[in-house]
Amino acid sequence: MRHSQYLIPLIQRGYVWTLTEQIFPLWEDLIDRMDAIAAFKVDAEKVGGAEKLRALRKHFLGTVVVGSAKGGGADTIPTREVIDGQQRITTLQILLLAFRDVVKPLEDEGLDYSLKTLTRNLGKYRERGHHLKVWPTNVGRDVMQALSDAGSIEAVCDRFPVKGPKKARYERPLMVQAYLFLHALLAAQLRGVRYDDSSAEPLDELDELLNEALGEDGSAEPTIADQVIRSIEKDNVVVPPRAELPLQAERAHLLYETLRDGFQVMSLELDDEDDPQIIFETLNARGAPLLPSDLIRNFVFLQATRKREDVDALYDAHWKAFDEKPAENAKKEGERFWRKEARQGRLKSVRLDLLLYNYVSLRKCEDLKVAHVFEEFKGWWESSGKGTEFELARITSTAKHFETFLLPNQTSRLGLFCRRMQLLDTSTLTPVV
């Protein structure tokens, strides 16, 4: 990763890994390999050399597919587009950033420099973000920049609180949650405290009620990892467990050795003539299904990239709201308007999929199946002959009217009509109206 940047293109979805589903299992794998390497060292000393022992297996993290290097010069950095594996590569970068910040108090120049070269492109660059090793999609860039610049868990907590004035509640971005979790457990591990040790903290009333609602007896003692997750969800300041204990340099070096030698990632580099969109769709065909709106966004901005259009400007003007607009009456700050499920007659899908379903039906003057929206959109787009800016502007304009169908205000004739359509549970006229 020296002097290069992994660029997550707009054909990818944002960061979606969660603490319980992906980050915690990754941490378990890391500690498993760390324990194995520590035991291997002891055994090697007993038998008189590592060459007399069977080599340790490495933990396979998966495959990362990247494009060929583009650009690079005196004040620019060569970039590689990540076609598949962005969740893994982003998480590993967050892990390295957290590790970098944890070991600062040790003042170990060698370790500091090694982690610095893995988390930052050293030098002066004219483009924003070129010093970062991983540059996410537009939605995550400010977060990754903040994590890179913060330098401490305290600064990250201050930048991304969960509680605000007047009892306001915020949901920390998933990348921030990953950083806080990994930082806290890294710091604990370097103090000799394991993630599965008992936290010795009794459950509060809210957690007891939750256990009761889930039918759990609560007999299992909460662990250090449980304590950290609860703190990330509830506390403005996340304090690493047993923070009064000193950090141990030998543990830090063992952890670095584990990351360097105990994990394996397969990297595949595409040739210039390979089609990243086709490869991306093929690789994800059997994974977590992408929504039609995800595929449409990927297709549109890949086409714009090929035409050398200003993709960032197009995204900010015409698609950013689809990714970031807050939901009405949101229970949590992170809920998004266009990602909420909605029902329209016999159809049930996320709002953005329903919008695009109706939009394509309108443009093609045909009745479609919502499952075929992407294929229909792609065929219509390629035959329309209109420019990217023109068509995206029409979609965003249509979206404003579609919001009235979703949330009729009844203060206008259109709103009253949409309310009556909802009561009749009919959607036949939606594309026409």
Language-model regions, residue ranges each:
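Short alpha-helix boundary/capping and kink motifs at helix termini
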Residues: M1-I83, H253, V265
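An acidic- and aromatic-residue-enriched active-site/binding cleft used to recognize and process polar
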Residues: I11, V66-A69, Q86-Q87, I94-L97, ...
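Phosphate/oxyanion-binding active-site loops and adjacent basic polyanion-contact surfaces
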Residues: T18-L30, R57, Q87-T91, K167, ...
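Short, flexible/disordered secondary-structure transition segments
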Residues: I37, K41, L106, G110, ...
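Flexible phosphate/Mg2+-sensing switch loops adjacent to catalytic phosphate-binding sites
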Residues: V42-E45, A50-E51, R57, V103-D142
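Functionally critical alpha/beta secondary-structure elements and their flanking flexible loops
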Residues: D84-Q86, T90-T91, L132-V134
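Short active-site loop/helix that positions an aromatic residue
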Residues: R88-P105, Q277
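Polyanionic (Asp/Glu-rich) segments that form extended negatively charged tracts
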Residues: N138-V433
